[in-house]
UniProtKB/Swiss-Prot annotation:
Originating species: Scolopendra morsitans (Tanzanian blue ringleg centipede)
UniProt similarity note: Belongs to the scoloptoxin-05 family.
Protein's UniProt keywords contain Cell division: no
Post-translational modification: Contains 4 disulfide bonds.
Protein's name in the database: U-scoloptoxin(05)-Sm1a
Lineage: Eukaryota, Metazoa, Ecdysozoa, Arthropoda, Myriapoda
Amino acid sequence: MNVLYTKIFFILILTRTSSALKCVQCFTGYGNIVQDCNKTSYSEPKECADPLSNYCFIGTRYENGTEYIQRYCAIFSIKDQCIEKNNIKACIYTCETDGCNSASRLQISSLVTSIISVLYLITFX
């Protein structure tokens, strides 16, 4: 019976690995390493190394007029949100389809976030 469970386990793992999620994976402006995540060479989705990765992640930080971007695979989903404190704005987005964390996805999300922020300020301020 244990042999049967072992076979099923490996079949499930191999099946999941062969259909792994593909996310854009790059970062900008950390230490001496700088990549432009908006360039075509970094915008091609790559298969996530961790078979548990079910989400793609985009993290942005705006500080002193500079934008820092991270795009990676993620194991869990985080509610899309932006936080602003001490003149630093950080935004987090997750999604579930191949390549959904590309530069075009971020531009759409940033536009939606900006519109919601303006509507909030008009309504509640």
